[in-house]
Structure formats: C-alpha cells, structure tokens
C-alpha cells in the first residue's frame, strides 16, 4: 500500500479558525484523537518473527504474515501507536493504586476534585505502523511512500519487539483532530513531549502524567496539517495520478488559509543508520 501526502504548518492563532473551515468543507465535526507513539529502532537484521514470543501468540496468522513482511525488509525506525484519552493522563492515583484502605474514594470530600480512573498499560491496544522513506525523483509534487500497519498484542510490547530485532528509543504523544473528505484523511495535529525526568527511561511509560504537564514540541504552539490518501495498489499509475489530483484539489480549496506542499524527503527518512 502507498500513501500520498501534502503538509502545511499552521500557526497557533490560526488553529481554531482552520478547524471551523475544515468542518464546513467536510460537513462533519472534528474527531479528536490522542495517541501514544513509541519509537523502536532495528538493532540487527530481523529474521522471521517467532510466533511463540510472548503475547504474539494471540495474533492471527494473516497479521503475523504482514508483520514478517514489514519487519524483514531492512533496518528501519518504526512506530507503535496506541489510542488514549485525556482521562488516561494523570489518572492513576498513587494512593489508590497502592491499595491503601485509607485512600480517598471517588466522591469523598478531601478538598480536591479526585476521581479514580486507572490507566491500564496491560490492556493498552497497539498497532505497528511502518513508513518507508519517501520515493525519490517523483515527478508529482506530492510525498509518496510505502506504508503498512498491523495489529499487535496488548500491554507490554517491548518483549516481542526486542525479539523481532527492535529496541525502544523514545515516545511522545500526538494530539489532533481528524476530518474525512471523500478519500482524503485530513489531520490537524501537534506533537506533545512528556515532562522531563531525572533519569532517562529505557522502556515505555506504564503511567501517564497529568495532561497539563505535557508540552508542545514546537515551542510556538504551531500545528501540522497533513492531508493523505492511501492507495492499495501503488503500481497502478492511474490510481496514483487520481489520488494526486484529489490532493491538488484540496490544496486549491485551502490556498487562502494554508499552503499545502510536499515534504522534504530526508526529513521523513525512517532508515536506521
């Protein structure tokens, strides 16, 4: 499967206005999206995935085949994505999670607004998203790259990823809103960093900090507008041309608000050096 994309930078002061414009253009309300994104790096040439590794036994045969195909093509950075909600951030109270019988229960008057909503890392769903480096020398003025995704076991994903030749590097959160216009997925989003820790962690977080402690990667608070189309058969030139034309049509519709353009190829290089 191939992905065709255009990107635009959106200043923070323009965010609300653009949301309204996209809602009118697509005749839909935005779908808010929060995602944990874990970055893994290949540290050796992967072999065939061992289907007996931990929770990977729970995967269906077709998912295992897709994972084998994705992870055996070379040495890349890849990301593991898990949906979360704002209620998951700061949800785990240390008192409530410790089993302390004197811990305040939801609804009791302790002088603070306390609500116990545990975030369960063990039940966190994940999917693996592979993105190749964008194709070079394409005549079309859009970013084109090979893409694939597959479901992964829930919970601690580091053990199977390590067994497949991938080590955990870092993680961040992406917050944004999604719109659909025919075959185009429009994603207005920003990257959020976790608060700094005294000691660097070499594994994904099992608990999430309060959402207010998350900070934008871009200090100015700007957002990224991404417009993408997935094409099942990247070898079908007619389908690829049609998808490009649809993106150009959206670019024309939004030209008074933002400048959608092709991304720098090397800025999206996922190869592990």
UniProtKB/Swiss-Prot annotation:
Pfam families: Med18. Residues 90-106 have a biased composition (Low complexity). GO terms for cellular component: core mediator complex; mediator complex. InterPro entries: Mediator_Med18. GO terms for molecular function: transcription coregulator activity. Its main location: nucleus. It comes from the Eukaryota. One of its GO terms (biological process) is regulation of transcription by RNA polymerase II. This is Mediator of RNA polymerase II transcription subunit 18. The gene is srb5.
């Amino acid at each position: 499967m191939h992905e065709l994309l255009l990107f635009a930078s959106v200043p923070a002061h323009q965010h609300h206005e653009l949301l309204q414009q996209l809602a009118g253009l697509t005749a839909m309300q935005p779908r808010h999206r929060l995602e944990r994104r874990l970055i893994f790096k290949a540290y050796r040439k992967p072999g065939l995935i061992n289907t007996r590794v931990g929770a990977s036994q729970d995967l269906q045969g077709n998912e295992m085949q897709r994972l084998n195909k994705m992870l055996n093509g070379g040495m890349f950075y890849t990301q593991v994505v898990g949906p979360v909600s704002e209620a998951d951030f700061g949800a785990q109270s240390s008192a409530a999670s410790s089993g302390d019988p004197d811990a305040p229960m939801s609804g009791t008057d302790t002088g603070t607004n306390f609500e116990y909503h545990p975030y369960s890392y063990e039940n966190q769903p994940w999917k693996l998203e592979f993105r190749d480096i964008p194709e070079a020398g394409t005549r079309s003025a859009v970013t084109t790259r090979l893409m694939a995704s597959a479901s992964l076991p829930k919970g601690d994903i580091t053990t199977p990823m390590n067994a497949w030749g991938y080590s955990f590097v870092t993680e961040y959160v992406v917050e944004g809103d999604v719109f659909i216009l025919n075959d185009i997925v429009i994603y207005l989003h920003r990257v959020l960093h976790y608060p700094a820790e005294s000691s660097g962690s070499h594994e994904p977080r099992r608990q999430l900090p309060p959402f207010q402690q998350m900070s934008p990667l871009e200090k100015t608070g700007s957002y990224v507008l991404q417009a993408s189309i997935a094409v099942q058969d990247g070898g079908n030139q007619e389908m690829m041309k049609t998808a490009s034309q649809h993106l150009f049509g959206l670019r024309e519709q939004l030209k008074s608000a933002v400048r959608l353009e092709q991304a720098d190829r090397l800025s999206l290089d996922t190869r592990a050096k």
